[in-house]
Amino acid sequence: MTTMAARRSEAAPAPQQLRGSQLKQLRELFRRFDMNGDGSLTQLELAALLRSLGLRPTGDEVHALLAGMDANGNGSVEFDELAAAIAPVLTTQTHLVDQAQLLEVFRAFDRDGNGFISAAELARSMARLGQPLTFEELTRMMRDADTDGDGVISFKEFAAVMAKSALDFLGVA
């Protein structure tokens, strides 16, 4: 075994702990953004993946994220490295959320069905979930999620918040 191969197997364990469907979803996501098909994500490819999730990381943030995931030190992220970074969360009952599932959650919050979540809808939904919000918490959540400043949360803004929350939970944001 070469030194690099030995280093890779130590630093980024294979993602056997992921269930089949999780591994398949993650592999599809990885392949979609591996633009040149070389089996690794460059900084630009990783940035594109993050942007597809609704995030807007700076170049420095993408660089730091890549450095944290790049277990073998080659300057890019291979599938096993991505899987190793995500597996701890996925194996604790968290699943990759597809657009249909995310839309279903969004619609549950969007009580009037107009395609936007208002502050009142957010407050009612959180209370129904057993997580009532103070006025300050509600104001902060709306301010953080409503990136275009129109006073409501669109699906795109909702998806971005959910993606950021997932990355924060992973410790990679």
UniProtKB/Swiss-Prot annotation:
Ca(2+) 1 binds at D34, N36, D38, S40, E45. Ca(2+) 2 binds at D70, N72, N74, S76, E81. InterPro entries: Ca-binding_regulatory (IPR051111), EF-hand-dom_pair (IPR011992), EF_Hand_1_Ca_BS (IPR018247), EF_hand_dom (IPR002048). It comes from the Eukaryota. Ca(2+) 3 binds at D110, D112, N114, E121. SUPFAM superfamilies: EF-hand (SSF47473). Keywords: Calcium, Metal-binding, Repeat. The keyword NADP does not apply. Residues 21-56, 57-92, 97-132, 133-168 form the EF-hand domain. It holds the Pfam family EF-hand_7. GO terms for molecular function: calcium ion binding; enzyme regulator activity. Ca(2+) 4 binds at D146, D148, D150, E157. GO terms for cellular component: cytoplasm. Potential calcium sensor. This is Probable calcium-binding protein CML14. It comes from Oryza sativa subsp. japonica (Rice). The lineage of its organism: Eukaryota, Viridiplantae, Streptophyta, Embryophyta, Tracheophyta. The gene is CML14.
